[in-house]
């Protein structure tokens, strides 16, 4: 391919609304152009990267036995009403009405549609297991689209859905998809981690996320360098940091702590470690019938509450922070001075594992301007309900017992779920077993953010010059840069011969035949991220030499013209082999 046929559209400056590196570089490199908030045109080079990503995904999904189909972007509301997600998903659904005033939506995902397909087409256990997948445009009406394609409203996604006879079958299908995802991201040349995750709005019994490791990632990944343990911060288990509770050594006392409303200030004022303080948080869970329920959650002063874990406490799924009036009623004190001693008997006290093993701790006294010191469980207040409700921190013991954890940042690009029978039971998706009895199909679902992968790869691979693509994703494998393509017959002939020879060998090559200065040409391809560059000019041809340079190489090499084709092919093959 020649550059004159590729519609190169590079820019010197990034758009003013671009916040992250990937957004800036994708616009500057001519991969995307913004149409409206969270909606983008993909220019030819950007589309070429998408097609390479899709091809890898499609090859591995087919290899794993999944069957490709295509489901409509527009879906009827009735299916989503069957599962309750029409109401639950709220404003994220882009809802539309047709001319007959019937409700539809633009799909954000397709569990309902594929379940409807399965219940109409699959009748017998003999037809199971089966796994359908599609690569299709999705839409989620994000409140605040940002970060370019990383958090857009319209995006491309590969979503797959497995149907099995039972849970054992689901586990096998799930593992097949997990292995396929691992191969996909390895082939793309990305540094990634598979982590234990929360199921979120899709539901189900178990899930794992695949994250591309990047300092700018939105998600915190808790992992153990000495083992394979990794989990999203929301789902990472936090063990008790104190092996067992010490005996009480002092009497409880109320002490003045004027204007000290957080644990750090209290610890400094009392000249004690912050690890000796306890943070008290009051929540309210409103009930449809009857009075609201109160929950006081306790974490150590230097720890943070994990709200996802808290939402799984029985009765707290729809809870909220208590208002000032509710705090006053339950504790007779303002926020900042709350504590479990003397709290309303209507409140359920839940202590994190570490707090449950603390002795002689400091907490709010439920009295403005005062805290309690020397507080002990059993003596000064009843034993609490003990649960894991905090965020993990660096240095925590790894839940698998193989060292301590660290935390890095990641960008979620894939998610696999064991859905179970949530959707099949809600929608009557059944099959007849060997005894002729109707059984609900057991489902799994598996997603990959196709367009998001472009942004994630750039966040992971870039420098001051531009994008550093993994070779399997790059818009080309090598670019040929002539010095005077239209001015020198010798240069033109050498470039054309190399271009045609590489094409015949199956190399993805671009010949930059534009009338551009060498510096501008080199800057463009450094920005776009061509993995390899060949420079051919009259000066080098005098000695039958050309320049060869890798995208991250400090210096170029002089290669004999007669050997450059083999050099390029060998470099590409070596690079590809290093990432598989």
Swiss-Prot record:
Q: Name one GO cellular component term.
A: cytosol
Alphabetically sorted, this entry's keywords are: Aminoacyl-tRNA synthetase, ATP-binding, Cytoplasm, Ligase, Nucleotide-binding, Protein biosynthesis
Protein's cellular compartments = Cytoplasm
**GO-annotated molecular function:** aminoacyl-tRNA deacylase activity; ATP binding; proline-tRNA ligase activity
Pfam families hit by this protein: HGTP_anticodon, tRNA-synt_2b, tRNA_edit
Known role: Catalyzes the attachment of proline to tRNA(Pro) in a two-step reaction: proline is first activated by ATP to form Pro-AMP and then transferred to the acceptor end of tRNA(Pro). As ProRS can inadvertently accommodate and process non-cognate amino acids such as alanine and cysteine, to avoid such errors it has two additional distinct editing activities against alanine. One activity is designated as 'pretransfer' editing and involves the tRNA(Pro)-independent hydrolysis of activated Ala-AMP.
Q: Which NCBIfam families match?
A: PRK09194.1, proS_fam_II
Name of the protein this chain belongs to: Proline--tRNA ligase
- Source organism of the structure: Polynucleobacter necessarius subsp. necessarius (strain STIR1)
């Amino acid at each position: 391919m020649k550059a004159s046929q590729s519609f190169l559209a590079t820019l010197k400056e990034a758009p003013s609304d671009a916040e992250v590196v990937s957004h800036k570089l994708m616009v500057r490199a001519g991969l995307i152009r913004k149409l409206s908030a969270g909606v983008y045109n993909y220019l030819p080079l950007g589309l070429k990267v998408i097609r390479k990503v899709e091809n890898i995904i499609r090859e591995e999904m087919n290899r794993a036995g999944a069957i490709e189909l295509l489901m409509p972007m527009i879906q009827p509301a009735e299916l989503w009403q069957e599962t309750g997600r029409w109401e639950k998903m709220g404003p994220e659904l882009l809802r539309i009405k047709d001319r007959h005033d019937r409700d539809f939506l633009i799909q954000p995902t397709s569990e309902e549609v594929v379940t409807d397909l399965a219940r109409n087409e699959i009748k017998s256990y003999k037809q199971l297991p089966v796994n359908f997948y599609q690569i299709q445009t999705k839409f989620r009406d994000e409140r605040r689209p940002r970060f370019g394609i990383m958090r857009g409203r319209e995006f491309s996604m590969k979503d797959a859905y497995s149907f099995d006879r039972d849970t054992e079958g689901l586990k096998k299908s799930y593992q097949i998809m997990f292995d396929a995802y691992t191969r996909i991201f390895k082939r793309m040349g990305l540094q990634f981690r598979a982590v234990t995750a929360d199921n979120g709005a899709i539901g189900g019994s178990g899930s794992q996320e695949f994250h591309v490791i990047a300092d700018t990632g939105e998600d915190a990944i808790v992992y153990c360098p000495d083992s394979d343990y990794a989990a999203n911060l929301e789902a990472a288990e936090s063990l008790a940091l104190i092996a067992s509770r010490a005996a009480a050594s002092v009497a409880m006392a109320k002490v003045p702590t004027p204007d000290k409303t957080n644990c750090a200030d209290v610890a400094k004022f009392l000249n004690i470690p912050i690890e000796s303080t306890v943070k008290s948080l009051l929540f309210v869970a409103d009930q449809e019938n009857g009075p609201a329920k109160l929950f006081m959650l306790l974490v150590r002063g230097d720890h943070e509450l994990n709200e996802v874990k808290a939402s799984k406490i029985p009765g707290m799924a729809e809870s909220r922070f208590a208002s000032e009036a509710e705090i006053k009623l339950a504790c007779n004190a303002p926020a900042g001075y709350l504590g479990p001693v003397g709290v309303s008997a209507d409140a359920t006290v839940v202590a994190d594992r570490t707090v449950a093993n603390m002795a002689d701790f400091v907490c709010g006294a439920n009295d403005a301007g005062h805290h309690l010191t020397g507080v002990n469980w059993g003596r000064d207040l009843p034993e609490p309900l003990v649960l894991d409700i905090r965020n993990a921190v660096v240095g925590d013991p790894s839940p698998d017992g193989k060292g301590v954890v660290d935390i890095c940042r990641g960008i979620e690009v894939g998610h696999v779920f064991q859905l179970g029978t949530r959707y099949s039971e809600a929608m009557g998706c059944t099959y007849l077993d060997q005894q002729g009895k109707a059984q609900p199909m057991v489902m799994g679902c598996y997603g990959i953010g196709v367009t998001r992968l472009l942004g994630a790869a750039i966040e992971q691979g870039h420098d001051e010059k531009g994008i550093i693509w993994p070779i399997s994703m790059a818009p080309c494998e090598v670019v040929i840069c002539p010095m005077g393509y239209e001015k020198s017959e010798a240069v033109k002939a050498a470039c054309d011969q190399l271009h045609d020879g590489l094409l015949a060998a199956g190399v993805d090559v671009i010949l930059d035949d534009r009338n551009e200065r060498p510096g501008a040409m080199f800057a463009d391809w450094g920005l776009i991220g061509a993995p390899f560059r060949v420079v051919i000019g009259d000066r080098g041809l005098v000695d039958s030499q050309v320049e060869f340079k890798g995208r991250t190489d400090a210096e170029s090499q002089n290669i004999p013209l007669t050997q450059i084709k083999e050099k390029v092919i060998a470099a590409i093959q070596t690079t590809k082999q290093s990432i598989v």
